[in-house]
Amino acid sequence: MKNFMDENFLLQTETAQKLYHEHAAKMPIIDYHCHLIPQMVADDYQFKSLTEIWLGGDHYKWRAMRTNGVDERYCTGKDTTDWEKFEKWAETVPYTFRNPLYHWTHLELKTAFGINKVLNPKTAREIFDECNEKLAKPEYSARGMMRRYHVETVCTTDDPVDSLEYHIKTRESGFEIKMLPTWRPDKAMAVEVPADFRAYMEKLSAVSGVTISSFDDMVAALRKRHDFFAEQGCKLSDHGIEEFYAEDYTDAEINAIFNKVYGGTELTKEEILKFKSAMLIVFGEMDWEKGWTQQFHYGAIRNNNTKMFKLLGPDTGFDSIGEFTTAKAMAKFLDRLNTGKLAKTILYNLNPCANEVIATMLGNFQDGTIPGKIQFGSGWWFLDQKDGMEKQMNALSLLGLLSRFVGMLTDSRSFLSYPRHEYFRRTLCNLLGNDVENGEIPACEIERVNQMVEDICYNNAKKFFQF
């Protein structure tokens, strides 16, 4: 029987162990997509408790706690103490066997705090107190956590109207780790509620200095903000979309649709799809002009629980995997830009049924200008676990080039999520190590395998994003 989470955790063969310990483990972290709060980095925030850094905003844990019968007040309530919330989480942990939360929980305790005990109701108080004592130390601040995990670069997720003041403050402070913004213009496409769209246009107008009264004005304002993001080091965009939009439209139609929604009139479903289709092309061309990488996270159905959405708002654990037929629209969208204006692209699916769809889509638009110009993004959200990672890498291996993969990202709001890179690296090394041991990759090519591991963990992303 193997020990739980020892130095060879997830590494089933000697070759896998060597690949991880001698090659993957030493590589710095490039976290090219995350949801960290920039102000926390700028201010070098000192966390008040383990509950704050670990449970605050973590909808993965909240979902598990609710499923375990824990009352909502211990997840998101304001009338419960940090200890009471943590105690309920500790009661839930033993019920998470085979859920990635169990591995993440103990990997985070081990790597951040040096705690090798399992978390359960008996150990909860001891672990809570020990972690809180350490969190009070300067080396456990927001920046301290990033240093602890050998992070080199992080890319946050930012709205076009954001001032980026905390990115600027962080850079000017001399902090050695790069924190770069990512352009996330979802609200500029959100025309479902006219009043919300109009309010967003007013914010965009104010921050850009462009008076907005037409579609062209809106694009001009967005372009000014896009330029500003580039000045602050931005190299990626990100789009959270249900599905790909590639309806046919004319300029006259889009102008009329803008005027209609800007004037407060609800759009038809067809008009909404046409507008989103036009905006994806506008953003794609902007990104191509700058040499950025465009990312698309698609396939989620969000805010499914109306009662809880009204109570708590978005991103609180009431989203799930959607079922959309997107292959034709995805191909049509990429093809429209493939007239010399297709930027580097990463496609992330939330439904694993689309793994092979994406893996084969990549090859349609690789143009030989750079290795892996169109990427299959790492397992995302509900697929951000061992099985999901393996399936994504297997599909990419079978239908593309795993060796050109830009690797892992946390996609997280937590400063304790960096062990997900370790989890990914161990999974990667186990896949490749097993192939060598099974004679599916020749042992005489081990140096190439060593290099492949280092490339996927770090080098490919460094070159691809030009950090």
Residue ranges and their predicted role:
Residues 309-317:
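Short glycine/proline- and charge-enriched loop/turn segments
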Residues 333-339:
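Short, basic/hydrophobic alpha-helical segments
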Residues 300, 305:
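Hard-cation-handling environments
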Residues 294-296:
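C-terminal amphipathic alpha-helical interaction region
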Residues 323-330:
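Divalent-cation-assisted or electrostatically stabilized phosphate/pyrophosphate-binding catalytic cores
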Residues 2-290, 339-343, 347-352, 356-359, ...:
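Metal-cofactor-binding active-site regions of metalloenzymes
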Residues 271, 317-320:
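Metal/cofactor-centered catalytic core regions of large enzymes
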